[in-house]
């Protein structure tokens, strides 16, 4: 199942710069693991925002939730998920 996932990171005022940097390092590693496993198919940065647009390929809604909640920055994110289906005009 393919999903369009839009993630926006909201950095809380007053967060320790060291904690945020550590979370970013861990986030990058986890994102790499999910891409290498084939679950995180595409990842694009949104210009001018601390956000991304991604395509995930997973077996279920529950699996997607598990993967997204495993991201170290998950507690700081607003996430919008859209399930995708093949378009009848696709060639």
Located regions from the model:
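Conserved, structured core segments of small domains
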Residues: 1-91
